Design a protein with these regions (language model features):
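Conserved "HGTGT" condensation-loop signature of ketosynthase/thiolase-family condensing enzymes
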Residues: 1-117, 121, 129-130, 137-144, ...
Length: 189
């Protein structure tokens, strides 16, 4: 299947890698960079100012099936190389804290100054549906005024692991990031 045709009549929005200020993103994983880019693309394409989502009135729900497999793989490989060398240190590109799924929510929250409720759901498409439902509940219960639901999947760094279990995973493995903003109102939530 052609992943560019998957959305039907809607064209995918390419995630341009924007210049991120400062040293904070120097060691950020691709998952984090894709997550920040997806939220940025949502705001840009919708004409929404960052100030609208800033603060405690915006919830963030992060969803993934791959759940940081890529960053964990990069960390394990770098650590194995470091331990295999007896002289000098091998510096891996991934810090241990970046191997946790909570890193995505944290980096996005820091970048967009989100301090509202957040959650992490691991499990793919069904988890995404659950995240959308949870977002509507957070809004309906008055725990937030709006909710971002962010899904990010990366596979490149651990493609060999997926190829070994190829009977379990249908092709193609498509790396993607998507974000929606839910707000209250008729046909909006």
């Amino acid at each position: 299947r052609d992943p560019w045709r998957a959305p039907g009549a809607r064209a995918p929005i390419p995630l341009a890698r924007r210049a991120l200020d400062g040293d904070r993103f120097r060691r950020a994983t691709r998952e984090c960079l894709m997550g920040v880019a997806a939220v940025d693309a949502l705001l840009r394409e919708s004409g929404i100012d960052r100030d609208i989502i800033r603060g405690r009135s915006t919830a963030l729900l992060y969803v993934t099936a791959a759940a940081y497999g890529s960053s964990n793989q990069a960390f394990v490989v770098a650590e194995a190389l470091r331990q295999a060398r007896t002289t000098g240190a091998v510096s891996g590109g991934t810090y241990f804290p970046y191997t946790a799924p909570s890193t995505m929510a944290g980096e996005v929250a820091i970048e967009f100054e989100l301090t509202g409720p957040y959650g992490i759901l691991i499990g793919g498409a069904t988890a995404t549906i659950d995240a959308l439902w949870q977002a509507t509940r957070l809004i309906a219960d008055g725990r937030c005024e709006r909710a971002l639901v962010l899904a990010v999947e990366t596979f490149e760094e651990c493609a060999d692991l997926y190829s070994r279990g190829r009977w379990l995973v249908k092709r193609p493995l498509v790396e993607a990031a998507a974000c929606v903003l839910l707000v209250p109102g008729a046909r909006r939530v």
